[in-house]
Structure formats: structure tokens, C-alpha cells
UniProtKB/Swiss-Prot annotation:
Coiled coil: none annotated. This is Glucose-6-phosphatase 2. Its main location: endoplasmic reticulum. Glycans are attached at N92. It is an enzyme of class 3 (hydrolase). The gene is G6pc2. It catalyses: D-glucose 6-phosphate + H2O = D-glucose + phosphate. One of its GO terms (cellular component) is endoplasmic reticulum. The chain crosses the membrane at residues 25-45, 57-77, 116-136, 147-167, 169-189, 212-232, 253-273, 291-307, 319-339.
Length: 355
């Protein structure tokens, strides 16, 4: 591993030295890969375009991030910004100097990359959905058009994934091999759901049972390793020790914060998609109207951006996790049930007048 780490440090140092002027773009691409954008941007948009794809997106994102957490606990991956300070392989303090940024100091283990894994699994779902839609509307003779569409969409996919990976390496929060593992892992999870039909038709009990299983397995795995004297939160004090600015340390980057956020979203989706409001609006007479879907998409996207202003207190971890779960659960409830139902009720008076 020292060889991978040392080679990775040289790559990071090269990127920071020669491509410092591209920091704005790389920081933007790092934000593009942020798993939280799945729930605040991609999901609200895609659910209104295609409910099945939007539902699958949540399942893929949640299960993918859960696997990411388990693998991080197993692989014990270091992050460059603290490894360079802890290692003793450089003689006479001759280690390269790695610059840190406001988004560098994540506190969980580094392998595989959560940003790379989340980005690849969700964009894989979007690309395959777009291909399925376009192919179904092409004539059988349009082989050239099909190949061009296929090439274009997958080129966009890889361009985004490579940019996200480079951005995470540039800010010294991941080694190159960690982002590669993340991309591969995300694609495998997304491909597995391509062969899992009926996810969009799951009952409330399936959502609840899945939530309970994911939570108990993660908690049980954590407690089991604690019995063997293995502290799975080993990375948190190291991150706090070597982060250049204490203000850059955020509790929402800890392993359990991501788990609670994902379980909240899946819990909320289960209730929303099996609610009476969803059945009356999205599954009702207005559900297929372009105007209804457009209004729902715009309102959902606007509302999700307002969510960013809701700050959860971090002084007490149990309270933070509880409020984070509730905030996350409210996202699909708003996007899937409440907003479509309100739009449906607003459109009803106009429909009645035309009859």
C-alpha cells in the first residue's frame, strides 16, 4: 500500500502544482459528485420525468452508499492529507507539501471514494434510462443514430466521472486508486439494479424491512469489530489532528452521518410512494400531463435548494443524527407526495371549468 500511497502523493502534488488555476472548475466537479446532490437535484428532476427511474435512483444511491460505508470500514483507507503527515517512509521530512482546501477534511476512511461511487452509480442510471428511452423511439433501421447516441451519452458519462475523480484527487481527500475503486463499485451496484425489476413497485413493508436490515447490519458490524478492539471511527481524531483549519471539519462527513441520511431518504420514499397523496396526484388524471410534471419538477427543485438553508445543530451528535434523519425523510415526502398533491389541487379548478 505504501507504493500506491507514495505514487498517489506524487500525482496529487503534480496536479496541485500544475493545475492550480483550474481550482474553480475542479471544485465545481467535486460538488457535482457530492452524494447529497442526488437527493436535492437529480432525484427531484428525474422523478417527475420518469417515476420508475427516480425511484430506482434512490435505491441505487442508498444501497451504493451503504456498501461504500461497509467497504470503508473493511479497507481502512487513509486520506492523503493526513497520511502524508503520519507516514514515516519519507526520510528527513522530505515529503511533498500537499495543499488543503475547505472541502478536503472529510473525516471518514478514504477507500473507496464516496463521491466517485455515488456519482458513477447515479449517472449510470441516468445514462441507461436515457438510452432506453431513445432506443424505444428509434426505427430499427436507425443503426447509425443509435450508435451516435450511445457513444455520446457514454462519453458524457466518462467525462463527468473522470472530472469528479480528478477533482477529489486534486483536493487531497483521495488517492487515485480510491476513486477508481469508487467508480467501479458504483457501476456494479447500478448494473445490479438493472436486473432487479419491480423496485419501483415495492410496498411500504419492503422499505421498512430494508431500512431495518441496513441499520442493524451496519450497527452490528460496528459493534462486532468493537468487541475485537477495532475502532471504526479511528479516522475522525486523525482528521481533526491534521486538518489545516478546524472550521473545515464537518460532522456530516462522519460515517454514521451518511448512513442516517440515506436511511432517512429511503424511509421517506417508502411512505411517500405508498401514500394517498401520491396516488391521487402522480397516479391520477393529471399525472401524465406535461404541464403537471413541469410544475412539479420546478417546484421540487426550488424547494430542495431552500433546504440548504436549514442548518442542523451539531453540538450534540444524537440530536444531529435524529434531525438529519427527519430532514432527509422529508425530501422524498415533499418531492413525491406533498408537492405533486398541491400542484394537483391547484390544477383541479381549471379542469372543472373546461368541462
Amino acid at each position: 500500500m505504501d507504493f500506491l500511497h507514495r505514487s498517489g502523493v506524487l500525482i496529487i502534488h503534480h496536479l496541485q502544482e500544475d493545475y492550480r488555476t483550474y481550482y474553480g472548475f475542479l471544485n465545481f466537479m467535486s460538488n457535482v459528485g457530492d452524494p447529497r446532490n442526488i437527493f436535492s437535484i437529480y432525484f427531484p428532476l428525474w422523478f417527475q420525468l420518469n417515476q420508475n427511474v427516480g425511484t430506482k435512483m434512490i435505491w441505487v444511491a442508498v444501497i451504493g452508499d451503504w456498501f461504500n460505508l461497509i467497504f470503508k470500514w473493511i479497507l481502512f483507507g487513509h486520506r492523503p492529507y493526513w497520511w502524508i503527515q503520519e507516514t514515516e517512509i519519507y526520510p528527513n521530512h522530505s515529503s511533498p507539501c500537499l495543499e488543503q482546501f475547505p472541502t478536503t477534511c472529510e473525516t471518514g476512511p478514504g477507500s473507496p471514494s464516496g463521491h466517485a461511487m455515488g456519482s458513477s452509480c447515479v449517472w449510470y442510471v441516468m445514462v441507461t434510462a436515457a438510452l432506453s428511452y431513445t432506443i424505444s423511439r428509434m426505427e430499427e433501421s436507425s443503426v447509425t443514430l443509435h450508435r451516435l447516441t450511445w457513444s455520446f451519452l457514454w462519453s458524457v458519462f466518462w467525462l463527468i466521472q473522470i472530472s469528479v475523480c480528478i477533482s477529489r484527487v486534486f483536493i487531497a481527500t483521495h488517492f487515485p486508486h480510491q476513486v477508481i475503486l469508487g467508480v467501479i463499485g458504483g457501476m456494479l451496484v447500478a448494473e445490479a439494479f438493472e436486473h432487479t425489476p419491480g423496485v419501483h413497485m415495492a410496498s411500504l413493508s419492503v422499505y421498512l424491512k430494508t431500512n431495518v436490515f441496513l441499520f442493524l447490519f451496519a450497527l452490528g458490524f460496528y459493534l462486532l469489530l468493537r468487541l475485537f478492539g477495532i475502532d471504526l471511527l479511528w479516522s475522525v481524531p486523525i482528521a481533526k489532528k491534521w486538518c489545516a483549519n478546524p472550521d473545515w471539519i464537518h460532522i456530516d462527513s462522519t460515517p454514521f452521518a451518511g448512513l442516517v441520511r440515506n436511511l432517512g431518504v429511503l424511509f421517506g420514499l417508502g411512505f411517500a410512494i405508498n401514500s394517498e397523496m401520491f396516488l391521487r396526484s402522480c397516479q391520477g388524471e393529471n399525472g401524465t400531463k406535461p404541464s403537471f410534471r413541469l410544475l412539479c419538477a420546478l417546484t421540487s427543485l426550488t424547494t430542495m435548494q431552500l433546504y440548504r438553508f436549514i442548518k442542523i445543530p451539531t453540538h450534540a451528535e444524537p440530536l444531529f443524527y435524529l434531525l438529519s434523519f427527519c430532514k432527509s425523510a422529508s425530501i422524498p415526502l415533499m418531492v413525491v407526495a406533498l408537492i405533486p398533491y398541491c400542484v394537483h389541487m391547484l390544477m383541479r379548478p381549471g379542469d372543472k371549468k373546461t368541462k
